A protein has these predicted regions:
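Non-heme Fe(II)/2-oxoglutarate
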Residues: 1-78
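Short beta-strand-to-coil "C-cap" segments at the C-terminal boundary of structured domains/repeats
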Residues: 15-16, 187-191
Length: 194
């Protein structure tokens, strides 16, 4: 039998060594001065979206561009990546993010500044809506990845995760006794009009 996998959904990840304590201090200072904005964040804080222009975050922005340039090459994309927007999130105990996508972007991602154990997994959902029309019963046990209906990823300090902006995702409630701090961002092709 010939077997081929078409239409894959690629999720990229990379661990980087940056000064997360410096980033944490900057984000907490902002949250003490700025009430934030409401998007998909429930019980959490979401900063306004021009964080990539703030000098203290340049080392992170540089790492994001390195990774995104590699992804653009692998994905055969013309032009070059630009950051559409970037913002910080603080999810206190009980805080979570509702299911959402990121319109007007090609790739979205997250970087974890502070991620205590049990502070909420990011969950990526099966993107093919018609795959839910008739869901077969499966054998007991762990099916191979190509049969999964969702992918759960534990947050890890210093990890960047980048995924297609159209991929539905959410964040589980923070069940730790501490805050989780992350940075979210969107990339688009330079010159692309949305």
């Amino acid at each position: 039998m010939i077997k081929a996998a078409y239409f894959p959904t690629i999720i990229y990840a990379k661990d980087v060594n940056l000064d997360n304590r410096l980033f944490e201090k900057a984000v907490i200072d902002w949250s003490n001065k700025d009430k934030g904005i409401k998007r998909t964040n429930m019980k959490g804080w979401h900063r306004t979206t021009e964080m990539h222009k703030i000098p203290v975050f340049k080392p992170l922005v540089d790492e994001l561009f390195k990774m995104q340039n590699e992804i653009f090459q692998e994905e055969w994309l013309e032009s070059e990546p630009i950051i559409g927007n970037m913002w910080a999130n603080i999810n206190p105990p009980g805080g979570y993010n509702r299911p959402h996508v990121h319109p007007n972007s090609h790739f979205s991602g997250v970087y974890y500044i502070k991620a205590p154990q049990n502070s909420g997994q990011i969950i990526f959902n099966e993107p093919r809506a018609t795959a839910h029309m008739v869901m077969p019963r499966r054998k007991q046990g762990e099916p191979p990845p190509h049969l999964w209906r969702e992918v759960r990823v534990n947050p890890l300090e210093g990890r960047i995760i980048i995924f297609p902006a159209w991929l539905w995702h959410c964040v589980d409630p923070n069940e730790s006794n501490d805050i989780r701090i992350s940075v979210s961002f969107n990339f688009i092709q330079k010159g692309f009009n949305v």
